[in-house]
Structures are given as structure tokens and as C-alpha cells.
């Protein structure tokens, strides 16, 4: 996976919700991390699928925590080590099938999502390619807790033609039961792209009581389930990325 331009890093300043005595200006430099897998079609390689996941969490907790009175390491195993590990895994899978890709894929690990989608907002306000060239953004946020019913949840499938049908059809061959919300987008870094009239998919495996608490630990991750989710997302990218799939933006799934 090549760096985009000369570096993998896209630095930006994040305004953090911390005490002034800790950081006088309440701002730190952080990064989006960007890799490129270039497509092979002379024309379609200039169109991009963005696959993203945020890599930040809550540190020692405090105000943003669901247990704000309990200071302790917030491990963020599902939110969102699951998403960033999926990003790496799917990136490796895509590289193994690179010759089949017509469209290009940008792999982006976003910083400062927990502070208000700051990394993805910076990305779309300072795009590394023209926004008109980004045809689909797939976001993975909390994809490590697949339940016994094998339900994969997503918003945004209605933002491009055939999206609902595609994401439903890809599930059963893998033993998955996609829960596709056609008319809603959901909330995470993909929303920043949706607001710029870009088709999106926001994928997760459901909420749980450990969300934003110190109890979100690796012992609770369903590794076999996450493997299935990675294959599901990979199959979606290959479908959209290896065919001249119609990616016309449909606002709010209409």
C-alpha cells in the first residue's frame, strides 16, 4: 500500500476537550493516515473508494466517557481498534487482488473522531483528491462484536443506486444477516462525506453496554465474527471497485 503523495500523514490541529492547565491552547497536532491502492482502468482509476476507520479513543476517560466519574484506561477494543484492524486486514486483502480493481482505493485512518469527527471533517475540507472523484466512502466503527444472529448494521446504503440490494445480497453467502437502513445515514466519520454529497456506508456490529467505558476490552471481541465482517466489506469494495458500478449520489437515500 503506497503512501498518498510523499507521506502517509495528513496532519491537522485538533481542538481537544481538556483542562487548560494540561494543554494551554487546548489543541494538539494529530494526523489522518492515508494509503493508496491504485486502480488499473485508465479512466476509472481516477475515481476513488475511501475505506476509513478512526483510530482514536478516550484515553483515561473523563467527560466523554459513559462513566465520566470513573477515571481509568478506556481500551476502546471495539471502538475502534476493531475498525482500524479491519482497515489493515482489508487493505491486505485488496492488495492481494489489486489487479482486479478498476477504481482506486484510499485507506484512511482518521484522528480525533471522538472529539467531533475532526479528522474526517479536515479530510473533506482539505481533500487529497477532488471530492467529485470520491464515489463512495465506507466507514467501519465498532465492527468487532458480531452477535449470535450475525447481524451487520449499516446506514447510507440508500445513498447510491442499488446500494440496499447490494449490501443485502452480499450477506447470506457469508452467513451474515445485514440490517440495512435505507433512509438513514447514522453517525460517525462517514457523515462528513455525506454532507459533501458523497455516497456512504457506515458499518457496525451494534451497540453494547461497554461503549465508552473502561470495559470495552479485547476479551469481548468476536474475532471470527470480525473476520466475516471484513470479508463482507471486501466483497462490497470489489463489487463497486472492479465494475463501472453507478455511484450517483442519492441524498438521504431518496
Where in this protein do the model-derived segments appear?
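Soluble metallo-hydrolase cores and metallopeptidase-like ectodomains found primarily
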Residues: 1-76, 89-92, 96-99, 125
Amino acid at each position: 500500500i503506497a503512501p498518498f503523495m510523499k507521506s502517509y500523514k495528513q496532519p491537522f490541529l485538533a481542538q481537544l476537550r481538556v483542562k487548560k492547565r494540561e494543554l494551554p491552547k487546548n489543541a494538539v497536532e494529530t494526523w489522518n493516515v492515508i494509503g493508496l491502492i491504485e486502480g488499473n482502468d485508465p479512466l476509472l482509476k481516477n475515481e476513488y473508494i475511501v475505506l476509513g476507520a478512526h483510530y482514536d479513543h478516550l484515553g483515561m476517560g473523563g467527560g466523554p466517557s459513559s462513566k465520566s466519574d470513573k477515571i481509568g484506561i478506556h481500551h476502546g477494543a471495539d471502538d475502534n481498534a476493531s475498525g482500524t484492524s479491519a482497515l489493515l486486514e482489508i487493505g491486505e486483502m485488496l492488495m492481494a487482488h489489486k489487479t482486479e480493481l478498476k477504481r482506486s482505493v484510499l485507506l484512511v485512518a482518521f484522528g480525533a473522531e471522538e472529539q467531533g469527527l475532526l479528522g474526517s471533517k479536515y479530510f473533506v475540507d482539505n481533500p487529497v483528491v477532488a471530492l467529485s472523484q470520491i464515489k463512495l466512502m465506507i466507514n467501519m466503527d465498532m465492527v468487532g462484536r458480531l452477535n449470535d444472529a450475525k447481524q451487520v448494521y449499516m446506514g447510507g446504503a440508500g445513498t447510491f443506486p442499488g446500494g440496499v440490494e447490494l449490501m443485502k445480497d452480499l450477506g447470506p453467502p457469508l452467513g451474515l444477516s445485514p440490517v440495512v437502513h435505507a433512509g438513514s445515514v447514522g453517525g460517525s466519520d462517514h457523515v462528513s462525506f455525506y454532507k459533501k454529497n458523497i455516497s456512504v456506508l457506515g458499518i457496525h456490529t451494534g451497540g453494547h453496554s461497554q461503549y465508552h467505558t473502561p470495559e470495552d476490552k479485547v476479551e469481548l471481541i468476536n474475532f471470527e465474527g470480525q473476520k466475516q465482517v471484513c470479508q463482507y466489506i471486501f466483497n462490497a469494495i470489489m463489487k463497486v471497485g472492479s465494475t463501472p458500478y453507478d455511484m450517483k449520489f442519492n441524498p438521504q437515500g431518496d
